[in-house]
Amino acid sequence: MPVPHRRLLCTALTLSALLALTGCASAASETTPDAERATQTGPLGDDDGYIPEGSSLPLDSGKPAVQRLDPALLGALREAQASAADRGTEITIADGWRSERYQETLFAQAVQQYGSEEEASRWVKRGADSAHVAGDAVDIATADAMDFLNRFGAEWGICQTYANEMWHFELLTEPGGECPAPAADGRG
């Protein structure tokens, strides 16, 4: 190959590589802040409120998933636990407070599972929209404890929030009040 053609080919390949790199950088800069938080390096851990699947925490745990719950919710749950224990039921949580990063990770997983953001939003809220991120919600670990809170939780203001999530509870009424009917799903 003559030298001028080789230079032309080398220049063309260099320009192509630069354009490709510029395109990648541009696409990367278009990611949303929520997506960036959800993909921060490192696995989810205690500081995110992560509780491994199949595990649960007692209400006296020192882990952030429990300790970062709203004090009123945690206090109500502990009072309910005392009554539940008298009936042979232990209240433990499968999820409590979560970091926004953890919540966004759960939402991204739900989108993959359900195929769309709309369908995923029936089951998981986005980042800061989640009551878990505010420390205002818990997911109860056992069916016995869910049943106990559904029957007696209003005594402490604790109510099931969504009809499609029998495990999800929040403070939704005054202690001794009446729980509102659960919303159909996370969309309200």
Q: Residue locations for each model-derived region?
A:
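Secretory targeting and sorting signals
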Residues: 2-29
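Cell-envelope/glycan interface and biosynthesis
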Residues: 30-188
